[in-house]
Amino acid sequence: MAKLTAVPLSALVDEPVHIQVTGLAPFQVVCLQASLKDEKGNLFSSQAFYRASEVGEVDLEHDPSLGGDYMGVHPMGLFWSLKPEKLLGRLIKRDVMNSPYQIHIKACHPYFPLQDIVVSPPLDSLTLERWYVAPGVKRIQVKESRIRGALFLPPGEGPFPGVIDLFGGAGGLMEFRASLLASRGFATLALAYWNYDDLPSRLEKVDLEYFEEGVEFLLRHPKVLGPGVGILSVCIGAEIGLSMAINLKQIRATVLINGPNFVSQSPHVYHGQVYPPVPSNEEFVVTNALGLVEFYRTFQETADKDSKYCFPIEKAHGHFLFVVGEDDKNLNSKVHANQAIAQLMKNGKKNWTLLSYPGAGHLIEPPYTPLCQASRMPILIPSLSWGGEVIPHAAAQEHSWKEIQKFLKQHLLPDLSSQL
């Protein structure tokens, strides 16, 4: 009798799961299926086919998928290959504190396209819980002065290294990365800056004094370890993160995921100084064969390494980690990161690290998150292409998440060895 097992059954979303099937016939082919519904009831699903060993066992840590949504040895393939039933869907966890994702795993007889797969019951099934927050993490709603967001504190007395988490063009408040980072020991402020609560509904300008207030708010908290903080940022959030690192002396470590090294849309303003946006050329906005918009060719002015529009990154005192998806269809992130690095090197700076991933797209998220190659952006335009190939994108997410944490710890925690 077939038996499906998964260890652990309940874990954080960035933790791997060991899946096995035992009790099969020797060399039997079995179909493994995974599915979940998000908080709006949207279905995401994946499947892969495996052949049992001579003793009737399948172990995803060692055995290759023969077909389905991925091929080869990929222990977590059922998770990162999940696809939305509705086109242009993106898996985003909104309520991180009160409920996990429930992922249903089934071991089934293989089927052919013309068969009715409902007729055959599964050989075995189970349900996994995938949490975005560890036990003991506290969430504090933030509405202080102008600041809007959510502060996540790890369990314990602290103090903990502080990080500000910034997302991009979707607006609103995204909490899933901040809650997960707090689960790994960082006091993390998910900071909203437009299209949320009483904040502006459109990003007409980037007021850096607002973000400075966010930094000061975080550093005032008794459980936050000063004197500096880190930034974790993506897309327009990374544009703002870079601007903060240049202008705010408290920024010690900045993670820039697929961001520009210039102002892309709305001007940045700080104490009267204005950083104007780069002129974009609409001729280079491409609608691909699937009807998805690709923006990555639009900022041709920045191709010149001495472009007057580039941020003066050499003025920053902290360290940078550039995370680049080389198949990004929203920004030419590889070019922009290399341009910023060249600017640092020209000024004798060595305060940077580059992680560049072939085949990875724009939305590099925590490990095992399904690749979103395209999604709707109703506030901007109907649909955007984010790029990325499933397997290399998954590998980039797993590797970069570990490196991001190492980078933040390296530059935000005191060097105890120097005190010995």
Swiss-Prot record:
It is found in: Cytoplasm, Cytosol; Peroxisome. It catalyses: choloyl-CoA + glycine = glycocholate + CoA + H(+); hexadecanoyl-CoA + H2O = hexadecanoate + CoA + H(+); choloyl-CoA + H2O = cholate + CoA + H(+); chenodeoxycholoyl-CoA + H2O = chenodeoxycholate + CoA + H(+). The active site is at 235 (charge relay system), 328 (charge relay system), 362 (charge relay system). One of its GO terms (molecular function) is very long-chain fatty acyl-CoA hydrolase activity. GO terms for cellular component: cytosol; peroxisome. One of its GO terms (biological process) is animal organ regeneration. The modification N6-succinyllysine is found at residues 40, 346, 350, 409. Keywords: Acyltransferase, Cytoplasm, Fatty acid metabolism, Hydrolase, Lipid metabolism, Peroxisome, Phosphoprotein, Serine esterase, Transferase. It comes from the Eukaryota. Its main location: cytoplasm. Its EC number is 2.3.1.65, 3.1.2.27, 3.1.2.2. Catalyzes the amidation of bile acids (BAs) with the amino acid taurine. Selective for taurine conjugation of cholyl CoA and only taurine-conjugated BAs are found in bile. Amidation of BAs in the liver with taurine prior to their excretion into bile is an important biochemical event in bile acid metabolism. This conjugation (or amidation) plays several important biological roles in that it promotes the secretion of BAs and cholesterol into bile and increases the detergent properties of BAs in the intestine, which facilitates lipid and vitamin absorption. Monomer. Belongs to the C/M/P thioester hydrolase family. This is Bile acid-CoA:amino acid N-acyltransferase. It comes from Mus musculus. The lineage of its organism: Eukaryota, Metazoa, Chordata, Craniata, Vertebrata.
